[in-house]
Amino acid sequence: MAAAAFFLLVGAQHIMVSEAFACKPCFSTHLSDIKTNTTAAAGFMVLQNINCSRPHEASATQGQVPSRKSSQCREAVGVPQYITITANVTDESYLYNADLLMLSACLFYASEMSEKGFKVIFGNVSGVVSACVNFTDYVAHVTQHTQQHHLVINHIRLLHFLTPSAMRWATTIACLFAILLAI
C-alpha cells in the first residue's frame, strides 16, 4: 500500500505544472501585428485573474465606443510566448493611440518589476499582450515585503496610478518640453 502511494505521489509530481506566471495584460488589442514564434515556455501555465479597479466605469465607456471589445478585464490563462510587437503609429485613430498609451503603461510596469529583480517575460496570453513574472517569486516578494515593512511606505509607485487621460497629458507635456529644448 505504501509503495502504491509512493508511485502515485511520484507520478503526480510530473503531472503538476512546474512554474506559474502572474501576468498583467497590456490591453493592446488594436496593435497591427502580434507575431508569436516557436520559443514558447513549454509546460508553463498562467493562472491569474486580472481585476479592473473600476469595472462599472469600464463597462460604461464600452457602450459609447462600439468598435471596442466587450471588456478590458481579462482572465489571463494560457502559455506565455515570446512575441514581436509591431504598432501602426501613423494611424490617427483614437483607439490605436489609446492602446499605445496602455502599452506604454504596461512597459512602465515591466520596468518597475524588473527593477525589483523580477525576470519579466512579454507574452501572448490568450491573444492579449501581457507582461508576465514568475508567480512564486512574486508571492515570496510580497510576503517578505509585507513582513518587513508592514506599515512603512518606502517609495511611491506613481506610474501605477496614472490613468490613460493622465498618460495623454504627460505625453503631451513631454513632447512640448522636447520641442522647446530642441529650439
Swiss-Prot record:
It is found in: Virion membrane; Host endoplasmic reticulum membrane; Host Golgi apparatus membrane; Secreted. One of its GO terms (cellular component) is host cell Golgi membrane. The keyword Secreted applies. Residues 1-22 form the signal peptide. Residues 23-160 are virion surface. Pfam families: Arteri_GP4 (PF02497). Heterotrimer of GP2a, GP3, and GP4. The GP2a-GP3-GP4 complex associates with the E protein. Interacts with glycoprotein 5. Interacts with host CD163; this interaction plays a role in virus entry into host cell. This is Glycoprotein 4. The gene is GP4.
